[in-house]
Amino acid sequence: MVHLLASEVRQLLHNKFVVILGDSVQRAVYKDLVLLLQKDCLLTLSQLKAKGEHTFEQDELVHGGQQGHMHNGTHYREVRQFCSGQHLVRFYFLTRVYSDYLEDVLEELQSGEHHPDLVIMNSCLWDITRYGKDFWPSYRRNLERLFGRLRQMLSESCLLVWNTAMPVGDKITSRFVPPEVQFTSSSVKISVIEANFYSSAEAQKHGFDVLDLHFHFRRHTGKYLQTDGVHWNQCAHRHLSQLLLAHVADAWGVELPRRDPVDKWIPDGPGRRRPGRRLERQPLVCGDQPACPLPRPLPLPGRQPLLPTPPCPPLFPLLSPQRHPIPLHQVMPPFPFCPQETCFSSDHPFQSDQFSLNYLHSDVPPSIQTEFAVQGDFQYGPQPPMPRFPPPCYQQRVPEVHRGFPRYHPPDPYMPWRRRPKTSKRRASAYKEPRPQ
């Protein structure tokens, strides 16, 4: 998976209205996305723990939070919004998957000036820990009501991604979880898996996308889960954002940049031994470059990259070396974790005149280029003309997204994984057997 830069995320979500609904984990998803739209840096621990603050990275607190009384009750409200010249991201804090308050939120989105282009939603932990022991009937009934209502009010062009709840730890000490539930953390872990199964099945039943975050993070609770057993650290949330953006790009028919993945915030998991093959070590976390880069994938049929990489320069005769530098494509080194006071935007903001309806809009990141000079002491014959290279990718016109491409669904426990059939290990017979008469 290629990790997108801030300039590429701005391009993918250009002129898009993104709505995120859910609990405190979803609030961290909102914060990391807002930060990634501006800087190539990670969240700090204090930003992850902050709740209901008046401002965060140039966003605003619209309603609730520190404007009123702060508490951990089921009636807590918090509405945040980040608005720039080309992006609008809004967050609604939910304590139940479907309620009268959620109905008011949906009516507000439906009657507002701007209609959402992307909705990211999850609600699980509050539903299974704060509404009594017999919560399953109401939770499943509310799921059915929710997706039925979303099917009615969302437009056909709006993409809804239901992400499953993240895994919880063996010991839960988060404040919103009641003390009597904290002593039964093992049962909460099982309930989260069961709730993810019901919610995923109901979302797919109504034709919505499902991103199984529980599947992706199931093996990383020991290192990236915080001590309260519920919330995750900054590396986990950046990896989550990249998974989410890759899913959105695929759903919108946008081809990701064809560059080698230079880092992974979280490894994919332990490798599997195969007969006759050596077990290779996985890349390290947070910016360690793999020893052997992966080959570039071939472009999918029917898709065109939003910002194609510059073409390779033509081959010249060996006896005519070039005296001028020739730009070549090179992979950018991974971004280290740095304090936000020292971070800077990775690119200039996109201008409105860069976008045209004749092209395809995508989140493909601009390629990073470096230069080297080929020096020669002799020159035979006239100097061949220098090729004209296209301008940098971030200065090219940006296409518009066309929907309708087939979507790729990553493997998860709730749907079959269509992989290539395994080769047979049976050997052919040494002697020809007589054919039956």
Curated annotation (Swiss-Prot):
Coiled-coil ranges from the UniProt annotation: none
Membrane-spanning segments: none
Region listing for Disordered, in residue ranges: 401-437
InterPro entries (UniProt xref): SGNH_hydro_sf
Biased composition (Basic residues): 417-429
Family: Belongs to the PC-esterase family.
Protein's UniProt name: PC-esterase domain-containing protein 1B
Species per Swiss-Prot/TrEMBL record: Bos taurus
Name of the gene: PCED1B
